[in-house]
């Protein structure tokens, strides 16, 4: 097995395969033990690799992760960006090659400054802290791409009960720590004092997760609300066609009116009204006149234009409330290339993918109030926003109910929409709140405070999902403290590992010289 730890392509290929295993641990495959195996193989491959070899090994892991887990990017570029097959393939490959470097630098840092092969327990703790820091960096750098976090694999796994304590971050930390400890067990067997501590650290997260899986951190704040979530299933290539506008507006109106039984909340998906709000005022006023006497609130996605202090127009991806409710929400976390184009002065006009409809949105302000419907506070997330754990927690902590609307037609029949759904489920579990998820073509679903889907519609079907959700009160530990305790722990562990490694390098002796 020395070929795994030595520099060279055999170990790099194994790292590539290890990265490819991580998406298989998540939706729609949900083979959660593969997440543990993936991280164990990565740690084993980095345990003795010199810095340069570790850098390439980390890059191979990242490429395997994204090549399998984000293959749906090709569909967005080819099918809806009007790029030719070779160009779409080239752009997708280039993006994956670039994203893989997220893992290259941490692997180099690990080998160069943090690793201590003579202290397997401390080494495992430092590896878990570095993994946590890496996931945080991936969700922040250049607005972030917080996809495929290891912790999502545990939504149906034994560690799920930890999510209300520390969010998906705590699950990822526990997985990385467990993987490293399992790899180091043979070495720990020769160190009885360290072995005892390692066994406690190995078993405690899994036992705690199982024990807390059904614990209710929040409580109902009122009676259940009847919900109608409308899935219009409008084809993406027709959505922004002006000739299809009237048909789409009639479609959502008719789907809403088709059932005589009263409901409390009606939710339409992202940009269900595919024209600027100012041009849809009469239509929205008609919805308001219908909903208000029936004590119904209707929430829909719609593009919104506002002017800044200089009088310049700014366009936003928004949600408005009609009927018995109030509020307007402007999306804050924008999708690169889908809602704004980085370096647009250079990229605009090169290919159709850089000129998609509604790809010039502005970012909404950070201090927006929540939406209000039937007297309840609703935390809104438009599409991509629900994948940001800290951002979502900030809104959820002020809310009684969670709402996410999306248009996942960009991803076709790939695994992307199912990954997106899984992340929404994790947000509900972290917050201990019900979530309404309404999409254009699926998956439209109702999610309970334990992250379980109670009702759902099939993808690519025009239908209305009827069900009930309950407003909740109280804060989970994660909503109260967010990721700050874990971030502090990671800083302490990484600082300790760095200081120990520097002291080790500074100390004279043949063992130190050999490690150099």
UniProtKB/Swiss-Prot annotation:
Pathway: Protein modification; lipoprotein biosynthesis (N-acyl transfer). This is Apolipoprotein N-acyltransferase. The keyword Cell membrane applies. One of its GO terms (cellular component) is plasma membrane. The gene is lnt. Keywords: Acyltransferase, Cell inner membrane, Cell membrane, Membrane, Transferase, Transmembrane, Transmembrane helix. GO terms for molecular function: N-acyltransferase activity. Its main location: membrane. SUPFAM superfamilies: Carbon-nitrogen hydrolase. Its EC number is 2.3.1.269. PROSITE patterns: CN_HYDROLASE.
């Amino acid at each position: 097995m020395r070929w795994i730890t030595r520099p060279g392509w055999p170990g790099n290929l194994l790292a590539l395969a290890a990265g490819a295993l991580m998406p298989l641990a998540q939706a729609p495959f949900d083979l959660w033990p593969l997440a543990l195996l993936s991280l164990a193989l990565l740690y084993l491959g980095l345990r003795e690799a010199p810095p340069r070899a570790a850098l390439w090994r980390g890059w191979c892991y990242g490429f395997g992760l994204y090549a399998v887990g984000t293959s749906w990017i090709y569909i967005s570029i080819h099918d809806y960006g009007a790029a030719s097959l070779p160009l779409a393939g080239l752009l997708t490959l280039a993006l994956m090659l670039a994203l893989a470097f997220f893992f290259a630098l941490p692997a180099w840092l690990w080998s160069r400054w943090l690793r201590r092969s003579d202290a397997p327990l401390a080494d495992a703790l430092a590896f878990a802290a570095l993994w946590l820091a890496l996931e945080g960096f991936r969700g922040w750098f250049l607005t972030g791409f917080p996809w495929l976090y290891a912790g999502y694999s545990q939504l149906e796994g034994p560690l799920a009960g930890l999510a209300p304590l520390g969010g998906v971050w705590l699950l990822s930390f526990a997985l990385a720590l467990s993987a490293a400890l399992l790899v180091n067990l043979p070495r720990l067997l020769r160190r009885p004092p360290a072995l005892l501590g390692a066994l406690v650290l190995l078993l405690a997260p899994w036992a705690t997760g199982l024990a807390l899986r059904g614990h209710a951190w929040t409580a109902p704040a009122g009676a259940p609300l009847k919900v109608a979530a409308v899935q219009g299933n409008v084809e993406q290539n027709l959505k922004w066609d002006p000739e299809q506008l009237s048909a789409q507006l009639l479609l959502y109106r008719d789907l809403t009116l088709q059932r005589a039984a009263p409901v409390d909340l009606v939710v339409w998906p992202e940009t269900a009204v595919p024209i600027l709000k100012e041009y849809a005022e009469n239509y929205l006023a008609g919805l308001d006149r219908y909903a208000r006497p029936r004590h119904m609130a209707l929430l829909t996605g719609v593009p919104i234009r506002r002017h800044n202090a200089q009088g310049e127009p700014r366009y936003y991806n928004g949600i408005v409330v009609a009927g018995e409710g109030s509020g307007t929400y402007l999306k804050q976390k924008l999708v690169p290339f889908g809602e704004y184009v980085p370096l647009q002065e250079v990229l605009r006009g090169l290919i159709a993918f850089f000129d998609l409809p509604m790809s010039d949105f502005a970012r909404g302000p950070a201090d927006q109030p929540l939406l209000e419907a039937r007297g309840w506070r609703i935390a809104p997330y438009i599409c991509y926003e629900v994948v940001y754990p800290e951002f979502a927690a900030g809104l959820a902590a002020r809310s009684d109910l969670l709402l996410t609307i999306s248009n996942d037609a960009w991803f076709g029949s790939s695994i992307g929409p199912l990954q997106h759904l899984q992340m929404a489920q994790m947000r509900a579990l972290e917050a201990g709140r019900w979530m309404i998820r309404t999409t254009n073509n699926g998956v439209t679903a109702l999610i309970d405070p334990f992250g379980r889907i109670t009702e759902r519609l099939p993808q690519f079907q025009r239908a209305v999902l009827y069900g009930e959700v309950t407003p909740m009160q109280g804060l989970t530990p994660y909503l109260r403290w967010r990721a700050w305790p874990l971030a502090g722990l990671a800083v302490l562990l990484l600082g300790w590992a760095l200081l120990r490694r520097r002291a080790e390098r500074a100390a004279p002796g043949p063992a130190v010289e050999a490690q150099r």
